[in-house]
Amino acid sequence: MKFKVKIKALEIALLENGASYTTLQKRTGLSSKTIFKVYHGKPVIPSTCVKIADALGVHASNLFERAD
């Protein structure tokens, strides 16, 4: 099962945390390719969702939804 990001929710979480694309990459340890996929609404695996949500201090369900 894969998930895609809720863009507005991600933008809000990033603003609230003073985080950027680069900051998120450093906090999660994910590759720039993976972060790019997330930012562009491409489907990602659950562990990626959890890493991003944890880095931003939110629950993964607030940032991601199932991809069709």
In which residue ranges do the predicted regions lie?
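Short C-terminal boundary/hinge segments that cap the last helix of small helical domains
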Residues: 57-68
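Residues in the helix-turn-helix
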Residues: 23, 34, 62
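DNA-binding alpha-helical recognition surfaces that contact promoter or target DNA
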Residues: 12, 26, 37, 65
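Recognition helix of helix-turn-helix/homeodomain-like DNA-binding domains
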Residues: 29-44
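Residues within the alpha-helical elements of helix-turn-helix
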Residues: 27, 55
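Short, basic-rich loop-to-helix N-cap that marks the start of a DNA-contacting helix
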Residues: 41-54
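A short, Lys/Arg-rich alpha-helix, primarily the initiator
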Residues: 1-23
